[in-house]
Regions:
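PLP-dependent amino-acid enzyme catalytic core
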Residues: 11, 18-355
Length: 355
């Protein structure tokens, strides 16, 4: 791994002078911005490994590599987008502080990025978010506000509360995925994969990417467009919330009704974000889904074969490779294992019954 020591983000902010206004059109997520994000983020995060197993290759019938982003600072890929977004704040925004809504991973990442930059952070989280994620966000230094969503979508309710707090306290309102600067930050994950692949003279045929709001897959697809070798980028979602798959078919953003029931709690967005969907719709080849049982089995295999802990959302790409193996015969796959924020109690509960 590289870059375990995160530098002072007040100094790093200088590298983001001239950052575009996130409110403007998504055409700004170009090669120049992606390079800017790469220069800012690559020395401020862990360079997470690509893991390989001959056993997994034999099971899937393909050459399979896991990008173990569960080992990232903060436990997920969200650290990349949070670091770059915070580095682009104005001095006035830094003084007032920031607010965001999140079910957990962006919450912790933004809290850590804000603490290192000296920026006050308030996070609005659903009251039913995993207790472990709430505790870790508070431990990272953020003020946490919990919401009760009732029968409504929990992300929608948390988003409304965050907007109200931003207006009341003059906080900068940051979105966990619907922001071009966050998307650019997330693109650095795929940049690492590309560097490692070139070093090992490996041609990647397909990248299986988890999708919640779409920030990671948009960054991945854009990085592959500008710096890659033409790998197919495939969206992976739980059966219960396949809004990206449906959106790719209809060519418009489809919504989930209520809060989808799935163990993949980090993937319960209302719909794909406008920014990531517009930026990457034409770059994503297709969407596929898997059920929660497949995710449970993938979590167990990740632990037993690779000795890594994945949360459900972090294991879903592996689940797709295993469950839909006939689609990937003799190909070289990279599975983006995007996070590992799960308590030991939940890990044992979710993996003890994998029928």
């Amino acid at each position: 791994m590289r870059g375990d020591n995160v530098p002072d983000l007040e100094r790093e902010a200088a590298s983001c002078e001239g950052c575009p206004d996130p409110a403007k059109e998504t055409a700004m997520i170009d090669k120049v911005l992606l390079e800017q994000a790469w220069k800012t983020v690559r020395g401020a995060v862990r360079w997470t490994p690509l893991l390989h197993s001959d056993y997994l290759d034999s099971v899937v019938g393909a050459r399979v590599f896991l990008k173990a982003e569960s080992l990232q600072i903060g436990g997920s890929f969200k650290m990349r987008g949070a670091l770059f977004r915070v580095s682009c704040l104005s001095e006035e925004q830094r003084r007032h502080g920031v607010v965001a809504f999140s079910s957990g991973n962006f919450a912790q990442a933004l809290a850590l990025a804000g603490r290192r930059a000296g920026v006050p952070v308030t996070i609005v989280m659903p009251g039913d978010a995993p207790q472990r994620k709430i505790e870790l966000t508070r431990r990272a230094g953020a003020t946490v506000v919990l919401t009760d969503h009732g029968t409504r979508n929990r992300e929608e309710v948390a988003s409304e509360r965050a907007r109200a707090l931003a207006a009341e306290h003059e906080y900068a309102l940051l979105h966990p995925f619907d922001d071009p600067l966050v998307v650019a930050g997330q693109s650095t994950l795929m940049r690492e994969v590309q560097v490692d692949a070139r070093r090992d003279q490996m041609h990647i045929d397909a990248v299986l990417c988890p999708v919640g709001g779409g920030g990671l897959i948009a960054g991945t697809a854009l990085a592959e467009k500008h710096f890659g070798q033409g790998a197919e980028v495939i969206a992976v979602e739980p059966e219960a919330c396949d809004d990206m798959r449906r959106s790719l078919i209809s060519h418009r953003r489809e919504r989930n009704v209520g809060t989808p029931q799935t163990i993949c709690d980090a993937m319960q967005a209302v719909s794909p974000g406008a920014v990531p969907f517009e930026a990457a719709e034409h770059l994503i080849s297709r969407g596929i889904t898997v059920d929660d049982g497949a995710v449970r089995r993938a979590m167990r295999i990740a632990f037993e074969e690779f000795k890594i802990v994945l949360e459900p959302s972090g294991a879903i790409a592996l689940a797709a490779a295993l469950e839909r193996r006939d689609e990937f015969t003799d190909r070289t796959l990279v599975l983006l294992c995007c996070g590992g924020s799960v308590s030991i109690e939940d890990l044992l509960r979710l993996t003890s019954s994998t029928h």
